[in-house]
């Protein structure tokens, strides 16, 4: 079973449908309606942290989830979830070089990564964010696997 932590974002259920098309055993939980102990009892195979409004430190249980389960359970962060992973490991999130609200831009893979399996090295993706993880402030535990055409961490 997979867990999708919903950070109160309408895109969460798009993720739910996509993940469910691969593995229908998925449970959605709100970022302020579940505890670490409850997540542990559910024994998820993977955790996905959704997009959402605000900054990572305002994303409910996301940073505690990352700190508790990183290295034990695969965790994927999308937008706000991605930023929460950055901050949980001691990285810095700041304003993006350019605000991206519903714009399509080219994303460039860096090396091979299972997450992007089957996609070309460069592919178009929708971007919708005002914040970004700062590459120069990433801890060495985190590896950049994709960048935008302007060099921001994806």
Model-derived features with residue positions:
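Amide-donor transfer/coupling interface in amidating biosynthetic enzymes
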Residues: 2-4, 8-11, 17, 21-44, ...
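Glycine-rich nucleophile elbow surrounding the catalytic serine of serine-hydrolase chemistry
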Residues: 79, 83-87
């Amino acid at each position: 079973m997979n867990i999708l932590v919903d950070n109160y974002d309408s895109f969460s259920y798009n993720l739910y449908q996509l993940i469910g098309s691969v593995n229908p055993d998925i449970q959605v939980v709100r970022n302020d309606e579940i505890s670490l102990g409850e997540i542990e009892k559910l024994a998820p195979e993977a955790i996905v942290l959704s997009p959402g409004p605000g900054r990572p430190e305002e994303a409910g249980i996301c940073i505690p989830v990352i700190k508790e389960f990183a290295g034990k359970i695969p965790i994927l962060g999308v937008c706000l979830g991605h930023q929460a992973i950055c901050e949980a490991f001691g990285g810095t999130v700041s304003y993006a070089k350019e605000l991206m609200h519903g714009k399509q831009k080219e994303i460039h893979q860096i090396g091979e990564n299972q997450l992007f399996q089957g996609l070309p090295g460069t592919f178009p993706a929708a971007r919708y964010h005002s914040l970004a993880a700062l590459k120069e402030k990433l801890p060495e535990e985190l590896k950049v696997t994709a960048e935008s055409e302007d060099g921001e961490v994806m």
